[in-house]
């Protein structure tokens, strides 16, 4: 009934208001109140007293120092397991915000020990617990014990697996040379030997990297690939990481281009604080080929979403300059792919 709805709304507003007062008294961001109430309802204050470090979760994104001060006000011991584990996860997340997908175990232990002013043995015990609980993944990378947040470990594994699946050759049209000639004529220019080879490769490979600095002819190659794919009846979409890059891509190719987020139809879930995408394995992109420009700016999470949205046989052309702006998020993917030597470049 309407009366019941009004009563529930009043209780919710009163609860949020009390929570705002509680957070303000303890010098915590009052804007966290709505999210906390959404999860814990009227028990939110009890939940915070029980484990103040739940606020360090990315869903809340509270400052670690403020949460730590609040926890110590509640007289939680400095070596409390919840504090140690939260400190380790905070350092891992901090590392991600600086572009790294993992942190060596020794470095993570030292950084957390300094953050919490605790002995390394206590931190190592916390790291072991997190690993046993599945809240942190430890793997050997280049002889190091590497520590990951689970979602980044899984993303890295998926991208490696998918890239390897895409490195095989495709059957090229028997009249490929004449198709490339026609593409060249349609652009009214003469391809340099390397440009011609790159355009030919776009017919022979499922995955191709087109790289080079400014003025090296990447735009000519992209336009040539588009002209070739038109003749091969390969439906092609174009995307770039930012609005500005997508606009530039559209202008230089004369085709429609969009941001990767828009192409994948990104949706932000208020409940979880997570980004999701409409296009994935179950709803793949309606194309036979995708050309991505400014790939150096694509981070690990976005590349994972992009690869999930491609049909199994969809071609992928990654274009960019590894010396240009790196991705804001974790993972220097484009440069790593070039360095690996596993992808045709």
Where are these regions (language model features)?
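Conserved ATP-binding/catalytic motifs of P-loop helicase motor domains
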Residues: 1-345
């Amino acid at each position: 009934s309407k009366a019941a709805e009004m009563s529930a709304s009043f209780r919710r507003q009163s609860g949020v208001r009390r929570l705002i007062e509680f957070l303000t008294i303890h010098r915590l961001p009052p804007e966290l109140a709505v999210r906390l109430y959404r999860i814990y309802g009227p028990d939110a204050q009890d939940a915070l007293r029980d484990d103040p470090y739940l606020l360090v979760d990315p869903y809340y994104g509270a400052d670690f120092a403020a949460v730590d001060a609040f926890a110590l006000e509640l007289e939680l011991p400095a070596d409390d397991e919840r504090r140690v584990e939260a400190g380790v996860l905070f350092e891992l997340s901090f590392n991600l915000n600086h572009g790294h997908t993992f942190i060596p175990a020794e470095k993570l232990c030292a950084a957390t020990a300094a953050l919490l002013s605790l002995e390394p043995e206590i931190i190592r015990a916390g790291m072991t617990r997190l690993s046993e609980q599945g809240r942190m993944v430890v793997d050997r990378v280049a002889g190091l014990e590497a520590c990951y947040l689970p979602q980044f470990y899984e993303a890295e594994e998926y991208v490696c697996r998918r890239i390897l699946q895409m490195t095989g050759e495709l059957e090229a049209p028997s009249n490929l040379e004449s198709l490339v000639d026609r593409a060249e004529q349609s652009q009214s220019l003469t391809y340099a030997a390397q440009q011609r080879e790159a355009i030919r490769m776009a017919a022979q490979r499922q995955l191709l990297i087109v790289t080079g600095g400014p003025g090296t002819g990447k735009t000519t190659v992209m336009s040539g690939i588009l002209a070739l794919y038109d003749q091969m009846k390969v439906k092609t979409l174009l995307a770039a990481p930012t609005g500005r890059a997508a606009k530039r891509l559209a202008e230089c190719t004369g085709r429609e281009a969009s941001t990767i987020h828009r192409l994948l139809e990104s949706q932000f879930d208020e409940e979880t604080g997570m980004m999701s995408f409409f296009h994935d394995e179950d709803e793949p992109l309606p194309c036979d080929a995708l050309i991505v420009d400014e790939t150096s700016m694509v981070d690990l999470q976005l590349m994972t979403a992009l690869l999930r949205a491609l049909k199994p046989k969809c071609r992928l052309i990654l274009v960019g300059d590894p010396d240009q702006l790196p991705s804001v998020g974790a993972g220097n993917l484009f440069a790593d792919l070039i360095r690996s030597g596993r992808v045709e470049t």
